[in-house]
Design a protein with these regions (language model features):
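Acidic, small-polar-rich N-terminal luminal/periplasmic segments of exported/outer-membrane proteins
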Residues: 3, 55-194, 583
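Outer-membrane beta-barrel translocator/receptor signature
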Residues: 159-162, 173-249, 257-262, 322, ...
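Acidic/polar loop-and-plug regions of large Gram-negative outer-membrane beta-barrel proteins
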Residues: 232-237, 244, 249-331, 348-380, ...
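Face-selective signature of the C-terminal outer-membrane beta-barrel domain
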Residues: 324-345, 374-506
Length: 781
């Protein structure tokens, strides 16, 4: 998973202030107000200290928590050809210091510090893994590692990450096929020019155990190696039976550290084994039925947080990821750099997990829960090659900073499921209760209250012969340019063209004495996407921008491993296109530009969404709209006090959700406009906010705390089931024992609040961990 951090020619790699991401207030008035508030601080920063313009400033904190929040001046993505301050997009960089201070141990942990991102849950067609939504749009396929798309459903780790970059808004000009919400770029650790060893050893409640190591060694003037290791084993606070363990290794070597030609070879391996969480079913919004819980209000059922509806001797999840990368670059001088990256990756996601399904209504009518078995056997492989040329030149008296590139990739997903013998997986009807005990019931149901996870569910598990293979081939060319007309005015433009082909094949198979014919589907789309942004700089440490961009989501966008799959209904349709507008501002204030403020107002429109048309066929006739505001802050008030946070408001509306069947008249199916027109996007809170701050009390003691707020989140477009709003508090304290050892205590969910953090299925909600306390020894030498 690792490769050399990439930056445009002449890029500055590190600086002590952070770019931020949170965009803006409603319209021009609020934007002007924000700028007015920031102006005095900005002017003070200019007169007091020119450090905000220094070419390279590296800050070393004096305490174990690395209290000074650090982030690069430029993105590690070489497609962003301007410093982050002058990039006309909302970009959030989560630096290593914030990841460490908050006690994050997974990608989803780290992303909770970024408002506007929500975590979805797995369901029948959607795999268990990192199901992410950005600005209301599904971004499941929009995760990249050092600029290369990372395919396959995974639960990603952070032990090998230097930082995490979140680009919000249309992402297709940068990454190809994608959603309108944005993308996530994971920046890997790579060999450095100094020797160091960093290690962590942590213990906590819920049987938490974790250890990591990060070792860098300089072999010669031009060669260095780096090795990252991780072991993790833990249960989940407040939840019965659920546990998981994983381990990973990530070595890398760089040749030519001080040469014009540099090559980095890296390998990443991570595998995990767990008993996955089942969550809690929703209370169906019925007007009748037994009042066994909060009858019919659409929230998750009112049972103890520890309630587990799964089966210990049936449920499991095993994953494995292997990624190898060769990154070669040559510096011709005069800021001209040629780079080529070749990567091969393979991942597997194999599971049986219990979805506490409420679709039959038995939860409310009879007080029983169907233990629906969601299963998957998936292997995904991908090979990609990316070549880019970046540099600077003068033309017509204007300075150009550009990147040109070519990308080729092939992705293949093989997906199947499990068959259980004996057993039916759907014994329920809407009119009869579901037996919950006795061998003849096969234990496919459980009582709503006090289910027995150790029910003796006996079966033989085999892989279904119905195996789907999806192959996706993509060819892309792109170009980006930042044109500096004057020191105050810049224009950022970019365009990308993609040739996208995807095929689905299901060979003929026989199951239960029934033969199913082979199925073959194909889609071929070409699409161009662009982005353009005009930047005005009131001062050297501020910018105001307006930008416009597009994105395309073709049929089969998920590559065969998600909900946006290829089917006969969509294979002949055009890509869904989104157009987005953003007005924002960024300021680096206080001496040295050590505190970053940002704000933006944005609007995204999709006017050819795939929905059911009046004739019952799927067509590109639907429409969606998201309007929103983001605010962000990151950096340091003083050398002792750091901060990282933001706020996002999203008004996400399904304007035209197509048509629904209303019955059959004279043999003809009748359709009417969807009753869900005008509803809020599912998995999209209207308001979300996050704030983390740390303060160094003495050279040896640092304390910190965080607050996360997420508004009500609907589980489906029907808007009748939802996870309630919640506020979570976290705390941290660290103590420097010696020059080499620091102890850090993290308490997450300080008040032990019961809340639900994963919702994207209308059947159940994911239960967040209860109060979790961990004590970690950070060792450096």
């Amino acid at each position: 998973m690792k490769q050399k951090n990439s930056a445009p020619a002449g890029a500055i790699q590190s600086r002590k202030h952070t770019p931020s991401s949170a965009p803006r207030l409603h319209g021009g008035t609020a934007l002007a107000a924000f700028a007015t508030l920031a102006m005095p601080l900005a002017l003070h920063a200019q007169t007091a200290d020119k450090a905000s313009q220094l070419p390279e400033v590296k800050v070393t904190a004096t305490t174990s928590t690395e209290r000074l929040v650090q982030a690069p001046v430029r993105s590690a993505n070489d497609k962003l050809t301007a410093p982050l301050l002058d990039t006309p997009k909302s970009v959030t960089v989560i630096p290593a210091e914030i990841i460490a201070q908050t006690g994050a141990v997974s990608l989803t942990d780290a992303l909770r510090t970024v408002p506007g991102i929500t975590i979805g849950a797995g369901e029948g067609g959607n795999p268990v893994g990192d199901n992410l939504f950005i600005r209301g749009y599904n971004a499941q396929t929009d995760t990249y590692i050092d600029g290369i798309r990372d395919t396959g459903s995974q639960s990603r780790e952070i032990f090998d990450l230097e930082q995490i970059e979140v680009i919000k808004g249309p992402n297709s000009a940068y990454g190809g096929r994608s959603s309108a919400g944005g993308g996530i770029n994971l920046i890997s650790k790579s060999p450095k020019t100094e020797n160091f060893t960093n290690a962590t050893v942590g213990l906590g409640n819920a049987k938490y155990r974790r250890a990591t190591a990060d070792v860098n060694r300089v072999i010669s003037d031009d060669v260095a190696v780096r090795l990252n290791l991780m072991f993790h084993d833990a249960h989940v606070a407040g939840r019965d039976f659920i546990h998981g363990d994983r381990w990973g290794i990530a070595p890398s070597i760089t040749f030519g550290l001080k040469s014009a030609t540099q090559a980095t070879l890296s390998y990443y391996h991570m595998q995990s084994s767990e008993l996955p969480d089942t969550g809690l079913p929703f209370n169906n919004p019925f007007s009748s039925g037994a009042n066994v819980a909060k009858n019919g209000n659409g929230t998750p059922v009112d049972v103890p947080r520890s309630t587990f509806y799964g089966l210990v001797n049936r449920d499991f999840r095993d994953t494995k990821t292997d990624i190898g990368t060769i990154d070669v670059r040559h510096d011709f001088g005069n800021n001209l750099v040629l780079r080529n990256v070749t990567r091969y990756g393979k991942s597997g996601n194999d599971y049986v997990w219990t979805q506490p399904d409420d679709s039959k209504g038995n939860t409310m009518l009879y007080g029983t829960v169907w233990r629906r078995a969601n299963t998957r056997v998936t292997d995904t492989s991908a090979v990609a090659n990316a070549t880019s040329l970046g540099g600077e030149f003068l033309a017509g008296g204007f300075k150009h900073t550009y990147t040109l590139g070519l990308e080729l990739s092939r992705e293949e997903t093989n997906r199947s499921s499990y068959i259980f013998t004996p057993g039916t997986n759907n014994p329920l009807t809407k009119t009869f209760t579901c037996p919950t005990s006795g061998a003849t019931t096969l234990y496919n149901c459980a009582p709503l209250i006090n289910p027995n996870a150790n029910d003796p569910w006996v079966y033989t598990r085999t892989v279904s012969p119905a195996r789907t293979t999806v192959v996706t081939n993509t060819r892309s060319v792109y170009g980006f340019d930042t044109i500096e007309f004057t020191p105050q005015w810049l224009l950022n433009v970019g365009i990308r063209w993609d040739d996208y082909k995807s095929s689905l094949n299901v060979p003929q198979y026989t199951l239960n004495n029934t033969t199913t014919a082979a199925s073959n589907l194909n889609v071929h789309s070409t699409f161009a996407n662009y982005q353009a942004g005009l930047v005005y700089k009131p001062s050297t440490n501020s910018s105001v921008y307006i930008s416009y961009g597009t994105s395309s989501t073709p049929p089969g966008n998920d590559g065969g491993d998600g909900l946006d799959g290829l089917s006969a209904a969509v294979q002949n349709l055009q890509p869904q296109d989104s157009k987005s507008f953003e007005l924002g501002t960024k300021w680096e204030v206080l001496p040295g530009g050590r505190l970053s403020l940002s704000g933006a107002y944005f609007q995204s429109d999709m006017n050819n969404a795939r929905v059911t048309a009046p004739d019952g066929n799927t067509q590109n006739v639907g429409s969606k709209q998201v309007k929103g505001v983001e605010l962000g802050i990151s950096g340091n008030f003083t050398k002792e006090w750091s901060v990282f946070g933001g706020y996002t408001h999203l008004n996400a509306v399904v304007e035209n959700n197509g048509f629904v069947s209303t019955g059959v008249v004279n043999g003809v199916t009748q359709y009417a406009p969807s009753p869900y027109n005008g509803n809020q996007f599912p998995t999209t809170p209207k308001n979300s906010a996050s704030l983390w701050t740390a303060y160094t009390v003495t050279p040896a003691i640092t304390i910190g705390g965080g607050i996360n707020y997420v508004d009500k989140v609907y589980a489906s477009v029907a808007n009748n089931k939802f996870a309630p709003a919640y506020t979570r508090f976290d705390a941290m304290a660290s103590y420097v024992l010696s020059r080499n050892v620091t102890l850090q205590l993290n308490i997450q969910n300080l008040t032990d609040k019961l809340y639900f953090d994963k919702v994207s299925s209308p059947h159940y909600a994911g239960v967040a961990p209860g109060r979790t306390a961990t004590l970690t020894a950070n060792i450096k030498f």
